[in-house]
Amino acid sequence: MSVETERSSTESSAASGLDFEDTALTLRLPGSLAAAAAPDPDRKRSSPSSSDAADAADNSSPLAAAADAPPAPKARVVGWPPVRSFRKNALAAKFVKVAVDGAPYLRKVDLEAYSGYDQLLRALQDKFFSHFTIRKFADDERKLVDAVNGTEYVPTYEDKDGDWMLVGDVPWKMFVETCQRLRLMKSSEAVNLAPRAAQ
């Protein structure tokens, strides 16, 4: 039976045009010649200086020099790789985390989406609608007040230096550039945070 399998394997290899040497696993690159990949063990290596001189003589023609030159760098196509619009918008946005004293969760707010402090306060009221309402006081000041127990909350922010400041102390653009995160503190805890103008 083994004779029959050998015949069938040789017949199939003859039919496909491949013999054992073509399909054998070796350490040479596919398609390279077997004689070039397997040097004769009795043959001595040539010295590198003599082979360099022979290569230099062969490369004297301009066609050979052009073939050995590295390929020119490819020009980068404008707009490639494609960047999705939501990634572009995400890079342009300035998200900061908002923490509320007594709330076990944080929210994120995009400061670039608002044009002033009033819009930011309304957005904070919307984010934490179960907690706060905005009340106007006699001196035309708006404050966030807890709807359940009447506790006042003061919006504060951490700047790039790590200092906690009151929201509204600086112009809006400067606030957007320097704000790292927001915190709505109870007004009783925010006593030490005085406006810069008062200091």
Curated annotation (Swiss-Prot):
<keyword id="KW-0678">Repressor</keyword>
<protein>
    <recommendedName>
        <fullName>Auxin-responsive protein IAA1</fullName>
    </recommendedName>
</protein>
<keyword id="KW-0804">Transcription</keyword>
<dbReference type="GO" id="GO:0005634">
    <property type="term" value="C:nucleus"/>
</dbReference>
<keyword id="KW-0927">Auxin signaling pathway</keyword>
<feature type="region of interest" description="Disordered">
    <location>
        <begin position="31"/>
        <end position="74"/>
    </location>
</feature>
<dbReference type="InterPro" id="IPR053793">
    <property type="entry name" value="PB1-like"/>
</dbReference>
<feature type="compositionally biased region" description="Low complexity">
    <location>
        <begin position="47"/>
        <end position="69"/>
    </location>
</feature>
<keyword id="KW-0805">Transcription regulation</keyword>
<comment type="similarity">
    <text>Belongs to the Aux/IAA family.</text>
</comment>
<dbReference type="GO" id="GO:0009734">
    <property type="term" value="P:auxin-activated signaling pathway"/>
</dbReference>
<dbReference type="Pfam" id="PF02309">
    <property type="entry name" value="AUX_IAA"/>
</dbReference>
<keyword id="KW-0539">Nucleus</keyword>
<dbReference type="InterPro" id="IPR003311">
    <property type="entry name" value="AUX_IAA"/>
</dbReference>
<dbReference type="GO" id="GO:0009733">
    <property type="term" value="P:response to auxin"/>
</dbReference>
<comment type="subunit">
    <text>Homodimers and heterodimers.</text>
</comment>
<feature type="domain" description="PB1">
    <location>
        <begin position="93"/>
        <end position="187"/>
    </location>
</feature>
<comment type="function">
    <text>Aux/IAA proteins are short-lived transcriptional factors that function as repressors of early auxin response genes at low auxin concentrations.</text>
</comment>
<dbReference type="GO" id="GO:0006355">
    <property type="term" value="P:regulation of DNA-templated transcription"/>
</dbReference>
<feature type="short sequence motif" description="EAR-like (transcriptional repression)">
    <location>
        <begin position="25"/>
        <end position="29"/>
    </location>
</feature>
<dbReference type="InterPro" id="IPR033389">
    <property type="entry name" value="AUX/IAA_dom"/>
</dbReference>
